[in-house]
Regions:
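Signal peptide processing junction and immediate N-terminal pro/mature segment
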Residues: 21-27
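Bacterial N-terminal signal peptides
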Residues: 10-21
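Bacterial N-terminal signal peptides that target proteins for export
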Residues: 1-11
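Flexible, solvent-exposed loop/hinge segments and secondary-structure transition points
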Residues: 28-267
């Protein structure tokens, strides 16, 4: 009776095949984007928000959506082509989305704007901004002509990164009557305060702002302009989660986002 010989090489190839199959399956599971906006929905909502007065420079914007696993699901821009916005803001928008998703919970929401003061030297989260680095191979992969399109090279991959100024917001929707954290939105391209305003209005248009309690004003994830100099002229946030006021003349004289674009199910 002849027993076929199985070489070590054959066993190795089989094992590698199993590993790749398993990894591929996990990637597909992580990449499920059914509960977050697609490219068309993001682009429409982002454009509507950018077209409003937001206290910045009126610049064109980048926007990125990630799912709860941190996988990029959509990247879009508001200008006529990919060069109409700051090119560097594409990756920053993805970094903001990753941050808002990574540090929000089903029962606690944090925006990137909320993190600014906490990560300063002496702050309770100092050093957070150096964790979870950006995956550069994903960030800069081409072709560049696909940037901001439905087939943007970041889509389907985890970007990583931590950003600690305005423009990143977690996304919550109702699934089977339960409030569910489904991912996050990141916006970049203007002042950090305008980025937050545009992200907030984009999330409002998408009707994904049924948020739980947060550390910002009125227990939300809104931006808090509560930084002022202490006795030694050092900037200090009264509540510990403050963000610099980029344009006091605008932000101090206009209605709060909580008034103009309240959180919760839209009427």
């Amino acid at each position: 009776m002849n027993v076929p010989k199985i070489s070590a090489f054959s066993l190795l190839i089989g094992s590698v095949g199993l590993v790749f199959t398993s990894t591929s399956t996990l990637a597909q599971n992580d990449g499920n984007c059914r509960d977050v906006p697609n490219h068309s929905q993001l682009k429409t909502a982002l454009g509507a928000a950018q077209n409003q007065t937001n206290g910045g420079f009126g610049l064109e914007m980048w926007g990125t959506i990630v799912n709860r696993d941190g996988v990029v699901c959509a990247v879009a821009f508001t200008g006529s082509d990919r060069g109409s916005q700051w090119p560097g803001s594409r990756v920053i928008s993805a970094q903001k989305a990753n941050t808002a998703n990574a540090f929000s919970l089903p029962d606690l929401v944090l925006s990137t704007a909320n993190l600014f003061s906490a990560v300063q030297p002496g702050g309770s989260l100092y050093g957070l901004q150096h964790s979870n680095p950006v995956e550069t191979e994903v960030a800069y992969k081409g072709p560049s002509s696909h940037f901001g399109q439905p087939n943007d090279p970041m889509v389907g991959s985890k970007i990583g990164g931590v950003n600690v100024f305005g423009g990143g917001l977690a996304l919550y929707k109702t699934i089977n009557t339960l409030r569910t954290l489904v991912g996050a939105l990141g916006v970049s391209g203007d002042s950090s305060c305008a980025d937050h305003y545009i992200a907030w209005k984009t999330r409002f248009v998408l009707n994904l702002d049924s948020i739980p309690g947060g550390v910002g004003p009125s227990s939300t994830d809104n931006i808090a302009f509560d930084i002022s100099p202490d006795a030694h002229n050092h900037p200090v946030s009264t509540g510990g989660w403050g963000h610099p006021n980029c344009n006091p003349a605008f932000y101090n004289s206009n209605p709060s986002l909580l008034v103009s674009h309240p959180v919760g199910p839209n009427p």
